[in-house]
Amino acid sequence: MARIAGVNIPTNKRVVIALQYIHGIGKKFAQEIVDKVGIPAERRVNQLTDAEVLQIRETIDRDYQVEGDLRREVSMNIKRLMDLGCYRGLRHRRSLPVRGQRTHTNARTRKGPAKSIAGKKK
């Protein structure tokens, strides 16, 4: 198993697919990385040489923000919104949907399990 950006990527998959196991790399960035390094699209991870793995690792470290750094940046952005006290920050603080979805019904994923109300029966 090749270890790139602190993630063990599966060896039997194509490189483009395997790179998507890294947080912050999707289809587009995986294809970009493979094109930059010059690896054929059908090549599998177990067929990569150590030099190619090193090239991939260096490309990701140099050009992309992945894993812990990306998670940290996202959480800092949310924290900044909450500290500002803007509408989006208040919605995050109250664990409600941020992007304008309705909350009278639905929004259970964001709000958590429904709280039962005593005496409310039909």
Curated annotation (Swiss-Prot):
The keyword rRNA-binding applies. Keywords: Ribonucleoprotein, Ribosomal protein, RNA-binding, rRNA-binding, tRNA-binding. Disulfide bonds: none annotated. One of its GO terms (molecular function) is tRNA binding. One of its GO terms (cellular component) is small ribosomal subunit. Residues 95-122 are annotated as: Disordered. GO terms for biological process: translation. Gene3D superfamilies: 1.10.8.50, 30s ribosomal protein s13, domain 2 (4.10.910.10). Belongs to the universal ribosomal protein uS13 family. Located at the top of the head of the 30S subunit, it contacts several helices of the 16S rRNA. In the 70S ribosome it contacts the 23S rRNA (bridge B1a) and protein L5 of the 50S subunit (bridge B1b), connecting the 2 subunits; these bridges are implicated in subunit movement. Contacts the tRNAs in the A and P-sites. Part of the 30S ribosomal subunit. Forms a loose heterodimer with protein S19. Forms two bridges to the 50S subunit in the 70S ribosome. This is Small ribosomal subunit protein uS13. It comes from Mesorhizobium japonicum (strain LMG 29417 / CECT 9101 / MAFF 303099).
